[in-house]
Amino acid sequence: MSFWKKSRYFAVFLTAACAMQFCAGCSVPFLEKQESDGSGYLFTASLPANPKSLDPQSATDAASKTIIENLYEGLVELDENGSPQLAAAESYTTSADGLVYTFLLKNDRYWFYDANQDDVVDDDETWKVTASDYAYAFQRIFDPQTQSPYTTMFSCLQNADAVQSGQLDPSEIGVRAVSDTELQFTLSRPDAEFLSNLASTAAMPCNENFFQQTKGRYGLDKESVASCGAFYLRLWFYDQYGNQNQIFMRRNAVNAKARSVYPTNLTFQIRKSSDEAAADFTDGTSDLMTSSVYQPQYMESDNYSVTATRSVTLGLIFNPDDTAFANAKIRKALSMGIDRANIGGNSSGDLLPAYGLIPPAIHWNGTSYRDTYPDAQTAYDPDAALTLFQQGMQELGRESLDSAKILVCASLMDCDNLHDVIQTWQEVFGFYIGIEEVSESDYWDRLQSKNYTVAVCGITASYDSPAGVLEQFSSRTNPFYYANGTTDAASRHCTSAVRKRNSSKMRPAGTIPSG
């Protein structure tokens, strides 16, 4: 969800709960018109962490993507309904078989690199964005040396597997610049999500000459970033021991008129946690706030502008090294032992039951995925759950579970209904599991070190697609060290099997969706 007071905005992620999953969401419309159009304004926001990289073909963290979206412009962008709209592209056509996409680029899009840092556009500091810049970006995605996390997203491209495995040169990927203003994509199979995926940060252009000049530093510091979007990077200062860290961006004059850019400057205070970022909004330091937790002081006030979407699913995750909770029957029994109908009753409407991993805010073919594929209901069946639980205990040769606690971070998620889940488990299975609340930094440290038994974790998409949710469970990238070859294979074939993957993800995996 997002909120503004007068010129201040607050974003909040609402949640939906299910087998142990909850949904939430947020948007950060810096250029959205409120009481005025924002012309000439300086907007300030706070990031909960320092961006890891401003390389669009590699960055995955939210802080990095926030900056990248203001630095670069792609061929298309998504509107408020998740439908792709033309951005840097003037037009496009699709072949009858859905395998060839041809884009014509606009002639008024430019790169800008303020080499002498005088905030003036000199002739030698700007050059046109061309089709080759987009082609090179996709070559980088599939170049094995890049190790880009976005190969699955664009696995439909011709020669994707062969290039990624090193059998073919990256230049053989199915993207070519026909001319400076004409770009052609060739797919090996139709992909209904391809056009929407072109709105992701991964599909932003990359100028090969500039990339080579950075000598391996591309996107890692201010001197290694060129802008082709609404703003350019003026300052990126970060000292892990300091508290004056910030990113300062100025309006990109060469693109401002064509893109109708309203603010003159954007300032991002770099904080160490979501709590610190929230405190900036409370004391008036920042104009915008995003949150995955219901904030009544903003939500229930007429003084703030609020935007909310259900884009996060909360789920229970289990330590893969824990013998008891690694047992599939015990995990399934716990899922069946959750009365999801009662989830969200006391949550002020921000928490709803969730029966699958993909939240309502995710789109598929321009509509909500859940409108097309509703959640498969997981029935509350305490008798069957107890029977399955006892079978699991017999397989383990145990009579009871060891004492354990569920790891939670209150600043990241709404866990009020967790007490109801625990009480139901005690009634059904005869054991009690506690709650351990930790700080945001400790929470992530504990997950990464696998120092937990059970934890509540928020699952959201890295991009607006069902595949963007399921890819969070990749054995290579997920934060809770869950590994499953079947899930990885399903994620690689997300376009043709997305509905099946959603079901298989929810049940055999070490995750129980709840709200």
List PLM regions with ranges:
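N-terminal lobe/hinge region of extracytoplasmic solute-binding protein
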Residues: 46-97, 104, 226
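Extracytoplasmic/peripheral linker and loop segments enriched in polar/acidic and small residues
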Residues: 376-378, 434-443, 468-515
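Aromatic- and charge-enriched surface segment that lines or borders ligand/interaction sites
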Residues: 90-152, 184, 324-326
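Ligand/substrate-recognition segments at binding pockets and active sites
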Residues: 242-244, 391-461
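Alpha-helical secondary-structure segments
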Residues: 132-136, 180-186, 264-265, 312-360, ...
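Structural transition elements
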Residues: 351-392, 413-415
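Ligand-site clamp/hinge motif
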Residues: 249-299
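Gly/Pro-rich hinge or "lid" segments in bacterial periplasmic/extracellular proteins
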Residues: 170-172, 176, 180-181, 186-265, ...
